[in-house]
Amino acid sequence: MKKRGFYNLKHPFDPCPFEFFCSGTWKPVEYMRIEDGMMTIRLLENGYVLEDIRPFQRLRLRSRKAALSDCICFLRPDIDVCVLYRIHEDDLEPVWVDARIVSIERKPHESECSCKINVRIYIDQGCIGSEKQRINRDSVVIGLNQISILQKFYKEQSTDQFYRWRFSEDCTSLMKTRLSLGKFLPDLSWLTVTSTLKSIVFQIRTVQTKMVYQIVTDEEGSSSTLSSMNITLEDGVSLSKVVKFNPADILDDSQDLEIKQETDYYQEEDEVVELRRSKRRNVRPDIYTGCDYEPDTIDGWVRMMPYQFGKCAVNVESDEDEDDNNEDGDTNDDLYIPLSRLFIKKKKTNSREAKPKSRKGEIVVIDKRRVHGFGRKERKSELSVIPFTPVFEPIPLEQFGLNANSFGGGGSFSRSQYFDETEKYRSKGMKYGKKMTEMEEMMEADLCWKGPNQVKSFQKRTSRSSRSVAPKTEDSDEPRVYKKVTLSAGAYNKLIDTYMNNIESTIAAKDEPTSVVDQWEELKKTNFAFKLHGDMEKNLSEDGEGETSENEMLWREMELCLASSYILDDNEVRVDNEAFEKARSGCEHDYRLEEEIGMCCRLCGHVGSEIKDVSAPFAEHKKWTIETKHIEEDDIKTKLSHKEAQTKDFSMISDSSEMLAAEESDNVWALIPKLKRKLHVHQRRAFEFLWRNVAGSVEPSLMDPTSGNIGGCVISHSPGAGKTFLIIAFLTSYLKLFPGKRPLVLAPKTTLYTWYKEFIKWEIPVPVHLIHGRRTYCTFKQNKTVQFNGVPKPSRDVMHVLDCLEKIQKWHAHPSVLVMGYTSFTTLMREDSKFAHRKYMAKVLRESPGLLVLDEGHNPRSTKSRLRKALMKVGTDLRILLSGTLFQNNFCEYFNTLCLARPKFIHEVLMELDQKFKTNHGVNKAPHLLENRARKLFLDIIAKKIDASVGDERLQGLNMLKNMTNGFIDNYEGSGSGSGDALPGLQIYTLVMNSTDIQHKILTKLQDVIKTYFGYPLEVELQITLAAIHPWLVTSSNCCTKFFNPQELSEIGKLKHDAKKGSKVMFVLNLIFRVVKREKILIFCHNIAPIRMFTELFENIFRWQRGREILTLTGDLELFERGRVIDKFEEPGNPSRVLLASITACAEGISLTAASRVIMLDSEWNPSKTKQAIARAFRPGQQKVVYVYQLLSRGTLEEDKYRRTTWKEWVSCMIFSEEFVADPSLWQAEKIEDDILREIVGEDKVKSFHMIMKNEKASTG
């Protein structure tokens, strides 16, 4: 009995076989007429006849209406369909247009399909012959009843029947619907030539759901018999054949198909058909695939867990191997869960020598690698991509209904027993009724379809379907690859529950935390024992040296000299015998900086850090702002000389060079003796500041975790001052005293790469678990794919979920750090998720963190931000917020940032400003109501006083703010970007540019438009920003038609390649021409269009190549791609000369010290963005003087933005400075100290520069 086809791709023809695109829609065509070599078509609508039609344009087979089975088996993302949609709002009726499916929101099918299908409408409709077509960015939601499936001719055609084509076939691509493809075009050519030579009229039409080439005669009206022509091929020659037929005697194919399907469906109950593995891609069949309970009746079949067991192996393959082996694989994003926990962590061993140990209740993994493909891998930087290392730990098989003890019959299951049984079974010819081994029966019992005839299904299952698709080799250890299967819904839930239960058991198994004093005493004992052991070894070695005779010492010295003469060059440092012996016995290194080597021990010559890893030393004479609120004065011990004490100004905060870090052995510095030497002065003070705020004191005996004075704090150090390394050092020491606290580090996507490199660079012993975002994880999985042989292969989404759960479990099991991006955190914290594991991970992230670290914590500062709301729900008050630019735009955002870092700040503000709240000792209200109340008081009292024009009132507001915040804010304002005087220097110039004639005309028109609005409309601001760079850029915006007519846009469009029409463009080209041979240039821009334009200009003018001399860094690049671009630009000797970067994509957390010239093409509303962008180049590691050019267009909105930005920067300085800050207008001076800039200005003949000012406050050289 034949099996019933669940889905059929071929379909009978519609009564109207073709459709034609006209009047903005696809209209059905009754027939195509060929007469005298001319083709005409007749439309079904009103019987219109269109003459001289070419079959290559706007004509195709008619699309068929989608059915319920299409939603189940055919429709998927990235296929083209025809949809019924109202293009314009003023249209009376919807029209049929082509579109592409973006995504499908699946819903259960009951009486009809209720799935929501997101599609994008093509812009160029009817152009099915074009290879490249434009498509709308915005998607629309439609239903199944609005979709038609595209059709093409079936590959088989008739040669001896009255019809030429019997079926059409479903088509997924718009390109493949062309009639010029396949065998229809030669037929059409034959009919056209025949109609001319023989004067015969043909009609291509549908007769009883079949397409015929009908011959039109005068006798058709009087006779029921029709004539058609068919074409046959004999000996390579096409011959025509005329066939007469009666339409009434022909059976409709649609009825034929229904009868056939009904016949195929009712099979004999004794016949058990083997499970057919679907060959479709990206589709899940709409069948019942799992059940967690026993069915009420025995009728029908229930799919159980489809496990196939063989020699299980984990193969790491390249992308090409994955594509070849997975040609029919399922890449849907639905949750297909593997038995990944059945595998042991992969080890790098030889496949022929791998002998894994036998374990009870586990399946042994044999590691195999494919040898082919050598030489195809490109060499990549080790740190350019964050590696993905999947780790799978074994889970007992009993959790999935498999009895591991039954394998082999003994108490344990060995690899040899398993493979001996399988080889014995496979070596025999498998026939029906053959007796199976006990192990095979167990496997079949777990793999079977449960039903009334399951015993017969065992006997009638063929051995071919259960065997490997790979041929058997002589090597018995060679792994076998089985056909891919997927887990049922019940197995998926069990696996997820197992992971979550593991986390719960890990949390429950944690012992009660010991007191800080007990933990400290235990650490001291451990360190004392280790030190005592080292001293004993040292004494023994010294005793041995004393007993050595003088002759032996001479011989040893001579051997060392001989070896040195062969190994060392004359200019290398030679290590004496005493230092060599000290190094062998465990030298207490005293590192000194050697400019050619790095951090080198002066005792034994050991190199601690190479010169490439050594940061430039920070200057000591920097202002250090720290208050003593909630901190005892006795905790800060200073050592001042007599002269310094006499000259100290008590109205100012103590100089950082005057306050030295505590050196007592009974404090937290004893926890990180090696890292302490690598911290700069300001970092050491911040280290103690963190301990006082988070734990209460630097001395463990004085720490009280229940104290009300401890809480969140802010590290506001200048960009590039080493905040990341400071936090790494603090976490290393913190976890030693508080191992039960689970630190969670959240960072922007761009800085995750920096965090990862820092942990590797400093060799931190604390385990770090990095949770990738979904897209980044899938990209890593493509680069290094893990293939599961013989078990269900998971989808990428499932692998990501398992990876997150596994890392969270390890985070709970051992003292470690969990690092993730803000985007991933927001995704996992969604409360409206329908998946139980998502809700569980959100619960864990809210309740488990004992310490929350927020890198670049000023980003989630909006009151309505979903990220900020999620962060406020994390149940810990111990938080550390890192920011180089704490004050952003206004005091409302500043208040939100402080509340995020220190939730107690809300109560502190209310106690200080709300007399009613202070009298009642707090009011029991909802947290968000208290926050709104505190925010209102903060803005009405403090912010208004600081914004006031009266100096005394402003000073009063600043003092109130400092009294409330200085206790938990540690501010470090180094020179320039915080890198200190050791850096070569920084010069910042503001260039006010005169516009060209065409620029002036455009900008004047746009400035007049602004006067009609209240505020600054975004569209007008965008147009002004683009026009100030180059006039042609206004045409790159979609809103340009609102301000310019078509004639003006046409004239502007001709200026694209004329660089002289833009004053900023001319300055960039002049600067690059003068410095390109010896310096690299970093160009920041807010929009993408200028980046693309400059790329084309550099290619045309300098003959550079994109990706070689020209590099771009924009927001659409994934994390690992950004890392590659940064490493390429920073690599010494790389041919890259210019990096065009989006200021939003790389303004924070990355190092671009290869550039010594920075150009800011447009101004920003937020001064912190400009400051962060400058800090990408002016930071530790910079070897040259950095020149920054801020370009402004005279008399435009850019000048207003610059003045507003300067005021915000002044307010920020007033908040964090103890001294009076001068008027910001005095920061600028009209002078030029840059030789290159002076040369450009001297040669300027068109007077492009209106004013050039140097920022004296921000510049250091």
Curated annotation (Swiss-Prot):
Top-rank taxon, per record: Eukaryota
Region (Disordered): 458-479
Gene Ontology CC entries for this record: nucleus
Single GO molecular function: helicase activity
Cell location: Nucleus
SMART domains: DEXDc (SM00487), HELICc (SM00490)
Predominant location: nucleus
Pfam families cross-referenced by the UniProt entry: Helicase_C, SNF2-rel_dom
Ranges for domain Helicase C-terminal: 1067-1232
Sequence motif: DEAH box, positions: 855-858
Domain Helicase ATP-binding per the UniProt entry, residue ranges: 704-904
Keywords on record: ATP-binding, Helicase, Hydrolase, Nucleotide-binding, Nucleus
InterPro entries: CLSY/DRD1 (IPR044567), Helicase_ATP-bd (IPR014001), Helicase_C-like (IPR001650), P-loop_NTPase (IPR027417), SNF2-like_sf (IPR038718), SNF2/RAD54-like_C (IPR049730), SNF2_N (IPR000330)
Residues annotated to bind ATP: 717-724
GO biological process assignments: gene silencing by siRNA-directed DNA methylation
Family assignment from sequence similarity: Belongs to the helicase family.
Assembly mode: Interacts with NRPD1 and SHH1.
Described function: Probable chromatin remodeling factor.
Name of the protein: SNF2 domain-containing protein CLASSY 2
